[in-house]
Amino acid sequence: MDEPSQGGDQKLSAMEHVKKRHEEKGFLYACLFMLCCCFCCYETCEHCLECFCCCCKKDN
């Protein structure tokens, strides 16, 4: 199997990480991964909230 190197995996955005986990492990795992993405993908919590939380959009 062709597996991406760890170096390439670290360059993924938070959303790309969640999509990858969804494909690999399923929906529930991806949701749990998203909740702790600041630990798993080294993004800040603010970045994750901007990407994933529709409640955080103040324009609406």
Curated annotation (Swiss-Prot):
Q: A Gene Ontology CC term for this entry?
A: extracellular region
What superkingdom does the record give?
Answer: Eukaryota
One example of the protein's molecular function in GO is:
metal ion binding
PANTHER family registered for this protein in UniProt? CADMIUM TOLERANT 3 (PTHR35470), PROTEIN CADMIUM TOLERANCE 4 (PTHR35470:SF7)
Q: Does the keyword Cell membrane apply?
A: yes
| UniProt-recorded name of the protein | Protein CADMIUM TOLERANCE 4
Q: Which GO terms describe its biological process?
A: cellular detoxification; detoxification of aluminum ion; detoxification of cadmium ion; detoxification of copper ion; response to aluminum ion; response to cadmium ion
Where the protein is mainly located, per its record?
membrane
In its UniProt entry, the species of origin is given as Oryza sativa subsp. japonica
Keyword presence, Cytoplasm: no
What is the purpose of this protein? Confers resistance to heavy metal ions (e.g. aluminium (Al)) by chelating them at the plasma membrane of root cells, thus stopping their entry and reducing their accumulation.
| Family classification | Belongs to the CYSTM1 family.
Inducing stimuli: Down-regulated in root tissues but up-regulated in shoot tissues in response to cadmium (CdCl(2)).
Chain ranges passing through the membrane: 26-42
> What keywords appear on the UniProt entry?
Cell membrane, Cell wall, Membrane, Metal-binding, Secreted, Stress response, Transmembrane, Transmembrane helix
Subcellular location(s) per record: Cell membrane; Secreted, Cell wall
Tissue specificity comment: Mainly expressed in shoots, and, to a lower extent, in roots.
Q: In what way does this protein cross or attach to the membrane?
A: Single-pass membrane protein
